[in-house]
Regions:
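Conserved ATP-binding TGD loop and adjacent catalytic N/P-domain core of P-type ATPases
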Residues: 17, 466, 476, 489, ...
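Transmembrane helix-loop-helix hairpins at the membrane interface
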Residues: 84-239, 395, 666-668, 694
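Small-residue-enriched core segments of transmembrane alpha-helices in multipass membrane transport
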Residues: 96, 399, 427-443, 666-681
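Membrane-embedded alpha-helical bundles of multi-pass transporters
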Residues: 109-115, 119, 177, 458, ...
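Conserved catalytic phosphorylation-site environment of P-type ATPases
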Residues: 430, 440-501, 505, 588, ...
């Protein structure tokens, strides 16, 4: 069984890497892929060996949570968590501002005249009270606002793993404990040795405040990256209008039993002189019920302006224009703006909108089996999938935190050994804390998945369904594209008499799809060699190749020939994409580096394909390649700046400038602010993909 499960509590790539490792190591789990930006885990497992509750317990042990309860709304959980995070952030700012005011001597400024006229014991008592009040405020900040950092860090260290929570917990706790020691024993321990001591409650508070602020902004930005999924989910109906089938059948029987030769008077009294479908619609009773209660075979009523709640078959249809049909907007599936006429026996899909008329629809696929649910699942799985570069980053993130801990310890020891002033210990501790805080695996971890999530969502809005991140990344390298002719490049003419089709001109038998030539021209200008495969005779194949602007074509081909061409091009060192729509294309689709299916093709072709074009507009082909190139470029930008940030900031926090005579370094407080900004900037940079023109 394969299932996508929401994960709560992940903050950095180390978090997602540890959750993935934990799930992958469980007996019965075949594969697990955890998405930080998607906040979900896609798990393939044997339900006879391992259960969801066992997975939940394993993940809970390291400080995270799997949401497996069907009665828990993911959107509601995310809303509640965001509200809680917002409250913690605001409260932490209050604590931090108060501590900063005390540490900056605002009390001395307010009561300066009184303190100056007081004796030394009063002044000492005042200073001691200020420090103790700062201690209490910092402790309250830790307990109420930073509690999750410490709880998660304890759980993770107990199981031998470490994430951003460990860095934050250790840095703030060291600053707090060192300051607490100085508050009560500073004069007794340091003053006799000639060491000037300080407290750093302000640093302890501000680290938590800045990290919480960064996460709040990050959550806001990540929610924006998931906008496409929310839009798709918004197409799902929550309720449906269930028709009383027993009454409807009685109406049908009554209408069928009425003799066609009834007098005019009785005909006038009836809703229609004929067995008008509107008769059944107007006289069928119904009730509004939750969509989850609908089962296959139920008949539902859909009115103008409403979304079709399930996949089904039209039982009855009527509109003010016609007595036996209605018009449905299928733009969310096909991308075509023109409403489609639906009559009795026609299929309708969930999420589509009835533009005019009334429909009675018999449910065929409901809930998770509907076309819309499948599209949502495909997009979620694609956004949760990982590009090859992300797997490398995850491996780095797994060791990043332990390496930072070692660097922090090395900084502490180095300053103690080479320091030449009496204040070397406080300075060494502050430098070590700054290294812990400023190192940010989050920026590296978010670099790839945020860009992928935005681009896959943008692709879905443009009727391009990408099944996995690897395909999206590989599209940029396409050098050759093999396109099947019939159904992909051309549309058969449904109006002709096929018994005499051979005697008709080629352009009457079928027609080139709109914008096909424009799409081919664009592909060629992008450096892609296009090959057309056709089962037609050579003259027909040449004709359609010329119409489409394709230089390379093959005629009278069999399914094996398509596969052979793909293999031949690959042997020449080219990255090959195959575009098809039928069962006879599946061998070539499976072999190609990137497989692309038309959304109106066979289910087999779409199952094999990595990318599905939901509309017949072939301009989506160059658009998908262009999107891939922009996405990979964005990922490289994000990774470059994330690595540069860590390479530059860690030495500055450790105090390297002192070695060159520059008496300046990044303090723990500013380190936390820079760390928060680095993560947010990566997410905001990825969001630029939403606004690019394809």
């Amino acid at each position: 069984m394969k299932k996508t499960i929401p994960v709560v509590g992940m903050a950095c790539s180390a978090c997602s890497a540890h959750v993935e490792k934990r799930l992958s190591e469980m007996e019965g789990v075949h594969s697990a892929s955890v998405s930080l930006t998607g906040r979900s885990a896609t798990v393939e497992y044997d339900e006879t060996i391992v259960s969801l509750s066992q997975m939940k317990q394993a993940v809970n042990d390291i400080g995270f949570d799997l949401v497996i309860e069907s009665n828990r709304s993911i959107a509601e959980i995310e809303r509640r968590n965001y509200t809680l995070l917002l409250r913690k952030t605001l409260l932490s700012w209050c604590f931090s501002i108060l501590v900063m005011m005390l540490s900056m001597g605002w009390g001395t400024w307010l009561f300066g005249d009184v303190l100056q006229s007081s004796n030394s014991s009063v002044l000492q008592s005042y200073n001691s009270s200020v420090l103790q009040l700062s201690l209490l405020l910092a402790l309250a900040n830790i307990l109420f606002c930073g509690r999750d950092f410490y709880v998660n860090a304890f759980k993770q260290l107990r199981h031998g793993v470490a994430s951003m929570d460990v860095l934050v917990a250790m840095s703030t706790m060291v600053a707090f404990l060192f300051s607490t020691f100085n508050t009560f024993w500073g004069d007794a321990v340091w003053t006799p040795r000639g060491i000037e001591w300080h407290t750093y409650f302000d640093a302890s508070c501000m680290i938590i405040t800045f990290v919480l602020t960064g996460r709040l902004l990050e959550e806001k930005a990540k929610n924006a990256t998931a906008g496409s999924i929310r839009e798709l989910m918004g197409l799902q109906s929550k309720t449906a209008r269930l028709v009383n089938e027993e009454l409807r059948m009685k109406n049908e029987e009554s209408a069928a039993a009425s003799p066609s030769s009834e007098n005019e008077e009785s005909a006038a009294a009836s809703p229609s002189s004929e067995n008008d479908s509107s008769f059944f619609i107007l006289h069928s009773s119904f009730q509004e019920v939750p969509l989850t209660t609908i089962t296959i075979g139920d008949v539902l009523e859909v009115r103008a302006g409403e979304r079709v709640p399930v996949d089904g078959v039209v039982v009855e249809a009527t509109s003010f224009m016609t007595v036996d049909s209605a018009y449905v907007d299928e733009a969310m599936i096909s991308g075509e703006p023109t409403p489609v006429r639906k009559s009795k026996g026609d299929k309708v899909l969930s999420g589509t909108v009835l533009q005019q008329g009334t429909l009675h629809v018999r449910a065929r696929q409901v809930g998770e089996q509907s076309a819309l649910a499948n599209i949502i699942r495909m997009v979620q799985e694609a956004q949760s999938s990982k590009a090859p570069v992300q797997r490398i980053v995850d491996k780095i993130a797994m060791v990043f935190v332990p390496v930072v801990l070692c660097l922090s310890l090395l900084t502490l020891v180095a300053w103690i050994i080479i320091g030449s002033t009496f204040n070397v210990l406080p300075h060494a501790i502050l430098s070590a804390i700054a290294v812990l805080v400023i190192a940010c695996p989050c920026a590296m971890g978010l670099a790839t998945p945020t860009a992928l999530m935005v681009s896959i969502g943008k692709a879905a809005k443009n009727n391009i369904l990408v099944k996995d991140a690897t395909a999206l990344e590989r599209l940029k390298d396409i050098q050759a594209m093999v396109i099947d002719k019939t159904g992909t490049l051309t549309i058969p003419n449904q109006q002709i008499d096929f018994t005499r089709a051979d005697s008709l001109p080629l352009e009457e038998r079928e027609q080139l799809k709109p914008h096909a030539r424009e799409a081919i021209t664009t592909l060629i200008s992008m450096g892609v060699d296009v090959y057309m495969m056709s089962g037609d005779r050579d003259d027909a194949a040449r004709y359609w190749a010329e119409q489409a602007g394709i230089r390379h074509y093959h005629s009278m081909v069999k399914p094996q020939d398509k596969e052979n061409l793909v293999r031949q091009l690959q042997q020449e060192g080219k990255v090959v994409a195959m575009v098809g729509d039928g069962i006879n294309d599946t061998q070539a689709l499976a072999l190609a580096d990137v497989s692309i299916a038309m959304g109106r093709g066979t289910d087999v072709a779409m199952d094999v394909a990595q990318v599905t074009l939901m509309s017949d507009d072939l301009r989506r082909l160059p658009e998908s390649i262009r999107l891939s190139r922009r996405t990979v470029s964005m990922i490289r930008q994000n990774l470059f700046w994330a690595f540069i940030y860590n390479l530059v900031s860690i030495p500055l926090a450790a105090g390297i400038p002192y070695a060159f005579g520059i008496h300046w370094q990044i303090t723990p407080m500013w380190a936390s602010a820079l760390m928060a900004c680095s993560s947010v900037s990566v997410v905001l940079n990825s969001l630029r993909l939403k606004f690019i023109s394809l």
